[in-house]
Each structure stands twice: as structure tokens, then as C-alpha cells.
Amino acid sequence: SVVGTPGHTPDHVAFFEVRTGSLFTGDAVLGRGTSVIDPPEGDLTAYLRSLRRMRELAPRTIYPGHGPVVLRALAKLDEYLDHRAMREGQVLSALGDASRTPEELAAEIYADYPPEVHELAARSVLAHLIKLEAEGRAEKRTKAGDVRWSAIEPRSCERCGRPVRGRVRLCGSCTVAVLQE
């Protein structure tokens, strides 16, 4: 069966053979290393959803587009999910209270890697920042063409407690209710 696995690219698919438990992952899961999520084509939120979807299939073997066959499929998918969670923690930690660029964050987070990988690493960091922004945990500010990111505390609607994004005080439903009162 064809399984939509957007994230690496918007139109990425994998193929699952139920009878044998074989999952052909293309670029979503590799035999070694991790897949690059490069915005705007790459979408980390969609990618994580795709990894969970592939895990729910309970494959036995992964046949990646690059690298060796993966015989411990569930362990590899868990490794990918854990890696992204670890990297997100590093991004938030590196942001701290500062306002920083993806390049500055990548230089710190990937300090143990050769400098020539930092440019691509900055793209991966950007994917995490975009995800964090969508979740209301980071914000982007642009001043005179300089784009910087900051961590923000998750906020809740002052009326109902639902999560809200950015610096608003009320969620959309409560805003409408207040206007109708």
C-alpha cells in the first residue's frame, strides 16, 4: 500500500507490503544518518507525524532510499523520533533567553561537527524553529532584514485555558464570545 509520508518533501510517499512487513521509505528514513528536513519544502511537524504513522504500521524491515537495509524497523523509527526530540531540546536550550539566528544556533549545537556541515545544520535548526513557532514556543522577529528567533513560554487563554499562540490573551473562540457579549 502507498503511505503518505510528507515532511522530507510535501509529496513524499513510502510503500508498505503488509504480508512481509516491508516498508520502503525512500528519503524519509535512511539506513544510516538522518533525513534532512529543509524548509520551506521540508516540514518537521509533518515529518514527525509521518514517522509516527510509519511506526503504527509495525514494519519488520525498512528498505531505505539510501544506506543499508534496516532489520530492526521499529527501533530505527524510535531512534529517529528520539533524535528529533533531543535536537528540539538542544534548540530550546541554545535559545535560552537570547535572540539568535539559525546559523548561530547551529554553530553551537553542532560544535563537534566539521564547520562545512553547519550550513545544512542551520536549515535543520530552522525546521525546528518553525515547528516551535507553530506551537507557540518560539517567535521570529525581523528587523532591517535580520531574522532572529527567541524562545517564548507557552501561553494559555485567560478565559478558558486553551493554548494560544504569540502574545494574544484570548483564543479565537473566546474572542468571538467576548465580542458577542
Where are the regions a protein language model picked out?
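Metallo-beta-lactamase
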Residues: 1-88
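Structural motif
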Residues: 18, 141-144, 165
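C-terminal regulatory/interaction regions
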Residues: 93-154
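Short metal-coordination and nucleic-acid-contact micro-motifs, chiefly zinc-binding Cys/His arrays
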Residues: 153-156, 167
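Short cysteine-rich clusters marking metal-coordination/redox-active sites
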Residues: 157-160, 171-174
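Short functional micro-motifs and their immediate structural scaffolds
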Residues: 162-165, 179
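Short Cys/His-rich micro-motifs in 6-15 aa windows
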Residues: 174-181
